């Protein structure tokens, strides 16, 4: 009996001694009946004492196995927690190093982390499905093996009690489910660890990219410095141009510089060292304002190009803002170039004054507006009228009030000429009614003795009852000038 109880079936279960005793199975039923009902699940009748004894050690073995698996899972959890703690420390160090980074890099890291998580999720689902499928296949194979073994034993021997096999199968399936859940739990920290490793790698890649990008910053700083130098040079040139007066020698020199390229080959020096030096010792104070718009457009960046060589300033994409600023500043300089047309005019005026030996004299030079010129002319006209009145004050038939009706009889012309040439004719013999005789005598005597041109026609004066005031005024002015040249009229020297 003890050897029979110690025997194990193919699937690891103990075989009860009732299998050899056909009388014990089924409450004393014959062996043929037990063989006929071997494949059916028989729940009739209470279990025997040997069946109970077999159940107890089976349950004890299952509980021991479960406890061992639980201990193993606890150890796995502890190890996974340690690994997670080490990875968290690594993450903390990486976060400290990345604390000085910009928010844009953090955003990119989050995006990369999300992408990696989304990529890892379908992989995890596939792994879980594959593990579940393999577990199901193993369970089906295990279930098939005990069933086939039980059938073979039933053919040769009596079948063991069905309750024990059913409970054992239930316990196996439960343990398999628990192991599957624990495997899933164990895969979760592994997945987290892989996600954390992926994040750490992405952060390292970002750090390397930033470390590569950092050496480019000095280039941008150097370019900014060169741009500031160019702006300072432009401001100094503008201040020098404002300090120079319109008629100063430096301006004339600038004009000479403008004329030389226009008359010559038209070549503009590319650097300040090639510009001609001024005799006053100002050196390179020539500004771009003295040049034309085309010269400014072509040569405004030449000083900066000569200051910094291509080897000092490496070309990089950030150079575009500096070129944009230069393009924006160019219109301002172009606008200021044509705003200085006074230089040539002042020079031409000086040349005219030097050529004629002094400033222009006369009323036209004193008065520039029409009202002042008219007032001056009226003043001169009145002065000349007063002079004629004073010269003919003692003569009869003469009353000079204007340059028109007072000169209609011709007696005023004869009296004025007789004043300076009393021996030319006898004024007492003249008749105011003889107008033609009077005009002819006055104009001919003035032409002979005073060299005064005969600007008035005798026929015109006789035909007009009231002579034209402008014609009379012009003739009297010419007579006065002729008398001054003869020395007969004294003028006040200023």
Swiss-Prot record:
Residues 269-279, 302-314 have a biased composition (Low complexity). Residues 1-348 are annotated as: Disordered. PROSITE patterns: CH. Residues 476-494 are annotated as: Calmodulin-binding. Residues 378-484 form the Calponin-homology (CH) domain. Residues 233-255 have a biased composition (Acidic residues). Keywords: Calmodulin-binding, Coiled coil, Cytoplasm, Muscle protein, Nucleus, Phosphoprotein. The modification Phosphoserine is found at residue 336. Its main location: cytoplasm. Maximal phosphorylation of Ser-336 correlates with maximal relaxation of aorta in response to acetylcholine. InterPro entries: CH_dom, CH_dom_sf, F-actin_Monoox_Mical. The keyword Coiled coil applies. It holds the Pfam family CH. GO terms for molecular function: calmodulin binding; CH domain binding; disordered domain specific binding; protein phosphatase 1 binding; tropomyosin binding. Residues 123-145 form a coiled coil. It comes from the Eukaryota. It is found in: Cytoplasm, Myofibril; Cytoplasm, Myofibril, Sarcomere, I band; Cytoplasm, Myofibril, Sarcomere, M line; Nucleus. One of its GO terms (biological process) is vasoconstriction. Residues 1-10, 74-104, 112-166, 179-232, 324-335 have a biased composition (Basic and acidic residues). The keyword Nucleus applies. Expressed in striated muscles, specifically in type 2a fibers (at protein level). Disulfide bonds: none annotated. Belongs to the smoothelin family. Interacts with PPP1R12A. Plays a role in the regulation of contractile properties of both striated and smooth muscles. When unphosphorylated, may inhibit myosin dephosphorylation. This is Smoothelin-like protein 1. It comes from Homo sapiens (Human). The gene is SMTNL1.
